[in-house]
Swiss-Prot record:
Disruption phenotype: Blocks TAFC biosynthesis, decreases resistance to oxidative stress, and attenuates virulence in a murine model of invasive pulmonary aspergillosis. The lineage of its organism: Eukaryota, Fungi, Dikarya, Ascomycota, Pezizomycotina. CDD domains: FACL_like_2. It comes from Aspergillus fumigatus (strain ATCC MYA-4609 / CBS 101355 / FGSC A1100 / Af293) (Neosartorya fumigata). It is found in: Peroxisome. This is Acyl-CoA ligase sidI. Acyl-CoA ligase; part of the siderophore biosynthetic pathway. Aspergillus fumigatus produces 4 types of siderophores, low-molecular-mass iron chelators, including excreted fusarinine C (FsC) and triacetylfusarinine C (TAFC) for iron uptake and intacellular ferricrocin (FC) for hyphal and hydroxyferricrocin (HFC) for conidial iron distribution and storage. TAFC consists of 3 N(2)-acetyl-N(5)-anhydromevalonyl-N(5)-hydroxyornithine residues cyclically linked by ester bonds; FC is a cyclic hexapeptide with the structure Gly-Ser-Gly-(N(5)-acetyl-N(5)-hydroxyornithine)x3. One of its GO terms (cellular component) is peroxisome. Pfam families: AMP-binding, AMP-binding_C. A motif (PTS2-type peroxisomal targeting signal) lies at residues 6-14. Pathway: Siderophore biosynthesis. One of its GO terms (biological process) is ferricrocin biosynthetic process. Its EC number is 6.2.1.-. The gene is sidI. The keyword Nucleotide-binding applies. Keywords: ATP-binding, Ligase, Nucleotide-binding, Peroxisome.
Length: 590
C-alpha cells in the first residue's frame, strides 16, 4: 500500500498544473483617443470640413440641409434661446416627430448650455405632465400632432404661457415647432427674437461650457413605475456616436436611412450623431415610422445603411417592393433593441443586401452603445452575439453575490467607462441602485440584462432578468422559443412570456403573428410538437394567443422605440385566459 501511495504522489506531481479559469471581464480598445469637445464644437468642426455636403434629408418635409445649413440654423435658434433668457443648465423639452427643426433645436440647446429633455412621442398627457414637472422644463417645443397622435388636449390645458397662467410651476412658454397654432409662439418667432443680439453673445456663452456638462435628459422606457431621466453629457454623446460610426465603417460617402425616432438614443445617437461625426448623410423617411416610406427612401436616396429594431424590419419586409426598387447600394446598418430571429436575418441578407449589417447592444444609461459587431465579423457571430465591447469601455458579468463569473457562464452584465450617465435626474436612490463603485474606485452600471461572454470576448445577451420564465425552479429563456416558433412557415413573429401557474410558478405562453399567406392556423399541439423537435419538452408553450383573434388586437404592442411591450402582453394573456375559463365553465353548466 505504501508503494502505491508513493506512486500516486509521484504521478500527481507529473500532471500539468490546472489552467486558471478565465473570468468574464473585458476591456475595449484604447484607440482612437476620446475627444474632449462639446456638441456645438463638433458641429462647427464638421461644417468647416464638410460644409457643402448634404447632412439631413427629410423626404416628407422636402428639407435637404447641408452641414453649413444645419450649423447656421442651429446658431439662429441658439441666439433666439439666449434672447429668451435661457441660462446654462436650464431644461428645454421637445416632443415631436422626426423633422429638421428637431435637430436644429438639439444643437441650439447644446450651444447655449441648456439641457434638452427629449420626450417620448407616445406619452399620454399625464405622462408628459409628469416628465415636464420632474425636470422643471422652462420651454417646451411641441407639434399639435405627431402622426395620428393629437396633442391639442395638452395645448388647451397648459396654454401658451403655463407658468404665467398657473397651469405649471416651471414651464414658461410652449413653442410650436412646425406650423402654427392659434395664440402660441412658433419656431420662427424664436429665431426672430435672437436677431437683435450682438454677434459675440453666442460665442460668450459657448466659452462657459465644458464637454462634461449634462446636455441631454433621456427617459428610460421602464415598464413599471415612473420613468427615470438619465443625465447624458456632451462627452458621452460625441464619443459614443463616433465609435458607433466606426463599427459600421461610415465615411462621408455613406447615406443612412433612419426610421427610429429622434426622441430615442437609436435615432439621435446611433443615427443622427453617428452620421454627423463621420460627415455622412442621414435620411429620415417620415415623421413617425412608415415602412412604405422607408422602402422609397432606400431606393430613391441610394442608401448604404439602414437602422431599425426587429419589428421595423419585419414591417418593411412584409410589404411589396415599390416599382423599380433598388437596394443595391445598401450594405450595413444596426439592428438593435431586441434579439434578431434567424429567419429575419436571412431575409435581410437576401432581400435587402445588408451583408455588412451589425448587431448592437446598449442602454440609455450608457449613451447608449456598449457592444457592437464589426462589419467583418462572420454572419454567425453577428447573428448570435452583439459583438465586442466598444473602445474605452469595460464590461463584466457577475453572479447574484456580485462576483465575476467564469467565461461561458451567464450572469448580470455590468458596464464601466466614459459613457456612463451621471445618474438619474433628481433621483439619488435609483442612481445609487444602478451605479455601483467597486473597491478599485471603478463605477459600474448594472444593466439588468443577462449575458454570457465567449473566450474571444464576444457577448451574447440571453435575456432580461425580468423576462426569464422560471418554471418549476428551472430558467427558460424566451428568445430560443421565439426563434423556434418564428421558423415555422405559418408564423411571422413570436413573442414569448411567462404565465402564472399554480403548480409550476410560471409556464410558457406565446403570442403569434401569422404569416400573410396562411389560410389556417396550426393547432396548439402541432406548434408544441414543432417546438419540442429542437427544444426540451418543458419549453413548449402551454398557452397560445394569436394577434387578431379572441379579442387580441392585430397590432403588436410596442414602445415608442419599437420594442415589444411584454408587460402589456402579460395583461392581455391574463384577460384572454379569464375569458376562456368563463367560456369553459359556461359550457360545463349546459
Amino acid at each position: 500500500m505504501a508503494t502505491i501511495r508513493r506512486l500516486q504522489q509521484t504521478l500527481s506531481h507529473l500532471r500539468p498544473p490546472k489552467a486558471p479559469q478565465l473570468l468574464s471581464i473585458v476591456e475595449g480598445p484604447t484607440q482612437p483617443e476620446l475627444l474632449d469637445i462639446t456638441l456645438g464644437e463638433l458641429l462647427t468642426l464638421q461644417s468647416l470640413q464638410y460644409g457643402d455636403y448634404e447632412c439631413l434629408v427629410f423626404p416628407w418635409t422636402g428639407a435637404r440641409w447641408t452641414y453649413t445649413d444645419l450649423k447656421d440654423e442651429a446658431d439662429r435658434v441658439a441666439r433666439g434661446l439666449l434672447a429668451m433668457g435661457i441660462q446654462k443648465g436650464d431644461r428645454i423639452g421637445i416632443m415631436a416627430g422626426n423633422c429638421e427643426q428637431y435637430i436644429s433645436v438639439f444643437f441650439a440647446a447644446a450651444r447655449v448650455g441648456a439641457i434638452l429633455v427629449v420626450l417620448n412621442n407616445t406619452y399620454t398627457p399625464s405622462e408628459l405632465y409628469y416628465a415636464l414637472g420632474h425636470t422643471d422644463c422652462r420651454l417646451l417645443f411641441l407639434t399639435p400632432r405627431i402622426g395620428r397622435h393629437s396633442l391639442e388636449e395638452v395645448l388647451a390645458k397648459l396654454g401658451p404661457r403655463p407658468k404665467e397662467q398657473g397651469t405649471s410651476s416651471a414651464l414658461e412658454e410652449i413653442i410650436i415647432l412646425r406650423g402654427q397654432y392659434s395664440g402660441f409662439s412658433t419656431y420662427e418667432h424664436v429665431i426672430q427674437r435672437g436677431l437683435p443680439l450682438p454677434s459675440h453673445a453666442l460665442q460668450d456663452r459657448e466659452a462657459e461650457l465644458h464637454s462634461t456638462d449634462v446636455c441631454n435628459l433621456q427617459f428610460t422606457s421602464g415598464s413599471t413605475g415612473n420613468p427615470k431621466a438619465a443625465m447624458l453629457t456632451h462627452h458621452n454623446l460625441v464619443n459614443n456616436s463616433r465609435f458607433i460610426g466606426d463599427r459600421m465603417n461610415l465615411t462621408s460617402f455613406d447615406i443612412l436611412c433612419c426610421p427610429p425616432p429622434l426622441f430615442h438614443c437609436f435615432g439621435l445617437v446611433l443615427g443622427m450623431l453617428a452620421v454627423v461625426t463621420h460627415g455622412s448623410k442621414i435620411i429620415f423617411p417620415s415623421e413617425t415610422f412608415d415602412p412604405t416610406a422607408v422602402l422609397h427612401a432606400i431606393s430613391d436616396e441610394k442608401c448604404t445603411a439602414l437602422h431599425g429594431v426587429p419589428t421595423m424590419f419585419e414591417a418593411i419586409l412584409s410589404l411589396p417592393k415599390p416599382p423599380n426598387f433598388d437596394c443595391s447600394n445598401l450594405r450595413t446598418g444596426i439592428i438593435a433593441g431586441a434579439p434578431v430571429p434567424r429567419p429575419l436575418m436571412k431575409r435581410l441578407l437576401e432581400e435587402l443586401n445588408m451583408t455588412e449589417y451589425t448587431s448592437s447592444y446598449g442602454l440609455t444609461e450608457a449613451s447608449p452603445t456598449c457592444f457592437n459587431a464589426l462589419t467583418t465579423d462572420s454572419i454567425e457571430r453577428r447573428l448570435t452575439t452583439v459583438g465586442k465591447v466598444m473602445p474605452h469601455a469595460k464590461a463584466k458579468i457577475i453572479d447574484t453575490q456580485g462576483h465575476i463569473v467564469p467565461i461561458g457562464q451567464r450572469g448580470e452584465l455590468c458596464i464601466a467607462g466614459y459613457q456612463l450617465t451621471k445618474g438619474y435626474w433628481n433621483n439619488p436612490e435609483k442612481t445609487a441602485e444602478a451605479l455601483i463603485t467597486d473597491s478599485d474606485g471603478v463605477t459600474w452600471l448594472k444593466t439588468g440584462d443577462e449575458a454570457i461572454f465567449d473566450e474571444e470576448g464576444y457577448c451574447s445577451i440571453t435575456g432580461r432578468f425580468k423576462d426569464i420564465i422560471i418554471r418549476g425552479g428551472e430558467n427558460i429563456y424566451p428568445l430560443e422559443i421565439e426563434e423556434r416558433l418564428a421558423a415555422h412557415p405559418a408564423i411571422e413573429v413570436a413573442s414569448v412570456i411567462g404565465i402564472p401557474d399554480q403548480k409550476y410558478g410560471e409556464v410558457v405562453g406565446a403570442f403569434l403573428a401569422l404569416a400573410a399567406d396562411v389560410s389556417a392556423r396550426p393547432s396548439d399541439e402541432e406548434l408544441r410538437a414543432w417546438t419540442r423537435e429542437t427544444l426540451g419538452r418543458h419549453k413548449a408553450p402551454q398557452y397560445f394567443f394569436v394577434f387578431g383573434e379572441e379579442g387580441v388586437d392585430r397590432t403588436i404592442p410596442v414602445t415608442g422605440s419599437g420594442k415589444v411591450r411584454k408587460v402589456d402582453l402579460r395583461k392581455i394573456a391574463a384577460s384572454v385566459l379569464e375569458r376562456r375559463l368563463a367560456k369553459t365553465a359556461a359550457i360545463k353548466e349546459k
